[in-house]
């Protein structure tokens, strides 16, 4: 049995987690602003990947990122004709979009656990909003951010439907771990080692994410 599919899934999940970390922190901070217009609507849109069937999510991503789309055309122009879909990049984006709601929710829990009096004290001492964000808010919310990244990584590692729609069954000739399990199962071959490896890895991520999340519920 080849472990290339697991390694490919690991690479995709790692890059997808980095993407969701950047966008997740920004979106979570935005949603914490109680005066944000249409805040509930934006929250609902961000959470949509949780309720959409993976194939439907993949279809929407194909429409947004495909050859006839503005984003797809811009990507091809930027990278000399390389498409975003049916490629490694498409797999990363599909995994990132699918896991983004989990990351945002965990980061928001972390932000809500930050004591407002500490923020007020920093402002009283003359710290500007940017300094407060990077020296007070984000460090205190770090366990929630880390928990979100772990959840997002576990979700990205096992993504199947959206990845299959956006990146195809093979990326440079290699399937992701989830697609490999399905292919081997349909071919009547043993998939237990790969399935067990992905399960152990995913459960470990969830275990540590849950431990970090409980810290916030006790602090909040």
Language model segments and positions:
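Membrane-interfacial helix termini and adjacent extracytoplasmic/periplasmic loops
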Residues: 58-96, 167-171
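Generic alpha-helical transmembrane segments of integral inner-membrane proteins
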Residues: 14, 18-26, 52, 200-211
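C-terminal transmembrane helix and the adjacent membrane-cytosol boundary/short C-terminal tail
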Residues: 38, 101, 105-127, 131, ...
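Cytoplasmic-entry segments and transmembrane alpha-helices of multi-pass inner-membrane transporters
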Residues: 27-61, 119, 143
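Transmembrane alpha-helix signature in integral membrane proteins
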Residues: 2-33, 44, 96, 149
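Transmembrane alpha-helices
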Residues: 18, 104-107, 115, 129-160, ...
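Short hydrophobic faces within alpha-helices
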Residues: 6, 31, 48, 121-123, ...
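Interhelical loop and adjacent transmembrane-helix boundary motif
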Residues: 1-4, 163-211
